[in-house]
């Protein structure tokens, strides 16, 4: 067999091929190492991100633990979420929580109800001032502060004119560092409700200006007669105020003109609001309140419905001339003096015989206050509040089995374990000695303001 002879040119080609394969292998190994390093870095970074996310969630849970209610949500959401958990039964099946809540609610209402007869200004002029700044976009009140306050303000207008029919109200909003008048001072509740519904669609913007709002309220209350009280109710949600000048001068002018200011705070306490309430209420700091939840906000609005007691610093007494007009019925429409519109019927002023549409109002011709006797009676109950009914003890022998007012049988709530009554469910008037159920008790004190037992007594002539 002949030997194989390899030329020099073939050897050179083999060397070049081996060198190229080696370089490609080295290059591939380098790229593989780089890819492995990149994968390891990405894997480690994802682990770090995951650990940071877990730590943030743990910190958030720890920080929100104090804000959580019994049902796992926020504390202010316990009122609505899983409300059926509030009614619980014990081992014997008694609805202990339900009875306890009724008794507790009554005790709370009785403790807060002030039955001391004070001299109060029943002819009121109130300026309702609402914060419509960016702070009202907070959602600690559902769905947010702005929507909640507008709804509660509408309810407040209804209740205010129901309990104070011969009073007047105006509405101001604070927005973009300015004060805007949305409803003139008048005694027509529908005008104020329509104005509140219109600003419900507006988005809160900017910062509030407490000084501008107080100056506008002062200007609206200047023409008010001396026999009327001058009040300003402010709903303030921000923690600061953007004022164009010295607000302390505005406070001094409010004090000199006997304008009393009450502030309902939605956030933390603000020093200038505390100073404002203290200066305008003869040193009383209790007129600045900070709400706790939605129920507390409703209670604060209800407190503002009751007229303020007249301070001893105020001078003397004022006799107010009032007119009781007669109702007229017409077959053809005639012009009224209050709106200059054609209307059927109305009321004739007994002083100048001008025609007005509705009551109560002030005659646009002679400035005489025109009211009905029922309006005066509804305002009078603030001066002489009805006494609180006393709960009948369970150990006493009951006089009757039916409520004197609604004629319904009193409920019997016993403990199945020992057979004792949990509560008598009877509340007695100290004057007429008649007994009422809890529903009639609440209705009599909050709406009727007259005891049916006392009113049904025969009049001795």
Swiss-Prot record:
Region spans: Disordered: 1-70
PROSITE patterns registered for this protein in UniProt: VWFA
CDD domains for this protein: vWA_transcription_factor_IIH_type
Disulfide cross-links: none
Keyword Transcription: yes
Family membership: Belongs to the GTF2H2 family.
Gene Ontology MF terms: ubiquitin protein ligase activity; zinc ion binding
Quaternary data: Component of the 7-subunit TFIIH core complex composed of XPB/SSL2, XPD/RAD3, SSL1, TFB1, TFB2, TFB4 and TFB5, which is active in NER. The core complex associates with the 3-subunit CTD-kinase module TFIIK composed of CCL1, KIN28 and TFB3 to form the 10-subunit holoenzyme (holo-TFIIH) active in transcription. An additionnal subunit, TFB6, plays a role in the dissociation of the SSL2 helicase from TFIIH after transcription initiation.
Biased composition (Basic residues): 53-63
Name of the molecule in the record: General transcription and DNA repair factor IIH subunit SSL1
Organism, scientific name: Saccharomyces cerevisiae (strain ATCC 204508 / S288c) (Baker's yeast)
The gene coding this protein: SSL1
InterPro entries: C1-like_sf (IPR046349), Ssl1-like (IPR007198), TFIIH_C1-like_dom (IPR004595), TFIIH_SSL1/p44 (IPR012170), VWF_A (IPR002035), vWFA_dom_sf (IPR036465), Znf_C2H2_type (IPR013087), Znf_RING/FYVE/PHD (IPR013083)
Compartment(s) of residence: Nucleus
Transmembrane segments: none
């Amino acid at each position: 067999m002949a030997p194989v002879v390899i030329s020099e040119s073939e050897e050179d080609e083999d060397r070049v091929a081996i060198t190229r394969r080696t370089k490609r292998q080295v290059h591939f190994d380098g790229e593989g190492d780089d890819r492995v390093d990149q994968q390891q870095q990405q894997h480690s970074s994802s682990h770090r991100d995951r650990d940071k996310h877990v730590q943030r969630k743990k910190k958030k849970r720890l920080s929100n633990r104090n804000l959580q209610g019994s049902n796992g949500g926020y504390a202010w959401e316990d009122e609505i979420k899983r409300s059926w958990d509030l009614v619980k039964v014990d081992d014997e099946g008694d609805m202990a929580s339900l009875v306890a809540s009724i008794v507790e609610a009554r005790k709370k209402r009785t403790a807060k109800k002030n039955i001391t007869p004070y001299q109060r200004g029943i002819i009121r002029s109130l300026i309702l001032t609402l914060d419509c700044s960016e702070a009202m976009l907070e959602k600690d009140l559902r769905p947010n502060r702005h929507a909640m306050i507008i709804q509660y303000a509408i309810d407040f207008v209804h209740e205010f004119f129901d309990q104070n029919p011969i009073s007047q109200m105006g509405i101001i909003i604070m927005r973009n560092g300015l004060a805007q008048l949305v409803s003139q001072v008048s005694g027509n509740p529908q005008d104020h409700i329509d104005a509140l519904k219109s600003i419900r669609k507006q988005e809160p913007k900017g910062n509030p200006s407490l000084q501008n709002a107080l100056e506008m309220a002062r200007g609206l209350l200047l023409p008010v007669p001396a026999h009327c009280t001058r009040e300003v109710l402010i709903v303030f949600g921000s923690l600061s105020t953007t004022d164009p000048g010295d607000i302390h001068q505005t406070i001094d002018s409010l004090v000199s003109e006997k304008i009393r200011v009450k502030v309902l705070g939605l956030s933390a306490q603000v020093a200038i609001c505390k100073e404002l309430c203290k200066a305008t209420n003869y040193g009383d700091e209790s007129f600045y309140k900070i709400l706790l939840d939605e129920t507390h906000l409703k209670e604060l609005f209800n407190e503002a419905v009751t007229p303020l007691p007249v301070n001893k610093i105020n001078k003397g007494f004022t006799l107010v001339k009032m007119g009781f007009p007669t109702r007229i019925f017409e077959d053809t429409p005639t012009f009224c003096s209050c709106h200059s519109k054609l209307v059927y019927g109305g009321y004739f002023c007994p002083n100048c015989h001008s025609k007005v549409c509705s009551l109560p109002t002030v005659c646009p011709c002679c400035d005489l206050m025109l009211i009905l006797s029922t309006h005066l009676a509804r305002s009078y109950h603030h001066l002489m509040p009805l006494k609180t009914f006393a709960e009948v003890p369970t150990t006493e022998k009951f006089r009757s089995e039916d409520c004197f007012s609604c004629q319904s049988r009193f409920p019997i709530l016993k403990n199945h374990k020992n057979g004792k009554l949990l509560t008598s469910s009877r509340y007695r008037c100290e004057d007429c000695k008649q007994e009422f159920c809890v529903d009639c008790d609440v209705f009599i004190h909050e709406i009727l303001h007259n005891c049916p037992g006392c009113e049904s007594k025969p009049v001795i002539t």
